Amino acid sequence: MPAFTEVADRVWVRRVPSYDVNLVVVGGERGLVVVDTLASAAEARAAIAAIGDLGAGRVVAVVNTHDHFDHVLGNGTFRDHYDGIPVHATEEAAARTDPAAPPAETTFASAAVIDLGDRQLELVHLGRGHTAGDLVVRVPDADVLLAGDLVEESAPPALGRDSYPLDWPATLDLALGMTTSRTVVVPGHGKVVDRRFVEDQCDELRTVAETIRDLATRGVPEADALASAEWPYPADALHHAIPRGYAQVPRTPRQLPLV
């Protein structure tokens, strides 16, 4: 398993080959916060051993950026190893997390703060995108944004069966509002990126949203949508995006012509 890489002051990233997912550790004078716990107990145990090798302190909390299995199934392993530490997530994410994970019990609707003494972590739910319950973690003093799967580097954004294609661009616009030209952005999957990368990905997602909205509004059948436009992503990345997007477009009921 790979070691941690320090990408900013006391912010370490462990990029795990399984699903190319990132586990992040943020340190402060009161301890460490782990963001996302990987896809299995075995992966979580390996991460715990690597955290010990950092020699940076004890884990005092866990954060789940959303509810997908590759980000939460190590929750129980971390909680057991560190004597019942709290797991934080949005209310939406916790409600959708596999009970076996187990789900976060410290939840919030819009924003929360974890105080590590000499630094604070801001947990913010900006809106729907990859899921209904995505959050980002901002570390202001280090100018770092942990974006979860709202941003992906090693593959196109995962527009899955529980995504919100028409909402995602606006949510990512809000995330960009939390960054500067120097911000280090850690995606849910892949290597660390910068603000420009996120801007480009947001533009691609906006193209997807606008194209779906245009096709649906013009009455193009959902089954014909993929072949009826140019898209920024390959077909297999849009398999769920098109039906999900079509379902979000309001339908105007047909009316009889006036005479």
Predicted regions: what is each one?
Residues 6, 31-33, 39-41, 92-207, ...:
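Metallo-beta-lactamase
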Residues 19-20, 39-41, 67-71, 93-96, ...:
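Solvent-exposed loop/turn segments at secondary-structure junctions
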Residues 45, 49-115:
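Active-site HxH/HxHxD metal-binding segment of metal-dependent hydrolases
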Residues 177, 192-259:
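Accessory terminal helices/loops
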Residues 2-50, 135-148:
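Conserved beta-strand hairpin/beta-sheet module of binuclear metal-dependent hydrolase folds
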Residues 10, 26, 36, 51, ...:
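Divalent metal-coordination and catalytic microenvironments
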Residues 35-37, 58-68, 88-92, 126, ...:
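Active-site neighborhood of phospho(di)ester-bond hydrolases with catalytic His/Asp-centered motifs
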